[in-house]
Amino acid sequence: MAKKGKGARLVITLECTECRSNPDKRSNGVNRYTTMKNRRNTTARLELKKFCTHCNKHTIHKETK
């Protein structure tokens, strides 16, 4: 059977918002997570509170392009 075009799920990247603006952090770099999202149910960009290893605390991670 042939597949129907693009599926509803796609892989997205979540990036820490405080890593870019805060020079006083534990280590250099920007923390990123990858996850999947259903574009039919969640049309807006995701914002999740996750642990950032560079800031060493829970911060808001936003979906990137």
UniProtKB/Swiss-Prot annotation:
Coiled coil: none annotated. GO terms for molecular function: structural constituent of ribosome. One of its GO terms (biological process) is translation. One of its GO terms (cellular component) is ribosome. Signal peptide: none annotated. InterPro entries: Ribosomal_bL33, Ribosomal_bL33_CS, Ribosomal_bL33_sf, Ribosomal_zn-bd. Gene3D superfamilies: Ribosomal protein L33. SUPFAM superfamilies: Zn-binding ribosomal proteins. Keywords: Ribonucleoprotein, Ribosomal protein. This is Large ribosomal subunit protein bL33. It comes from Synechocystis sp. (strain ATCC 27184 / PCC 6803 / Kazusa).
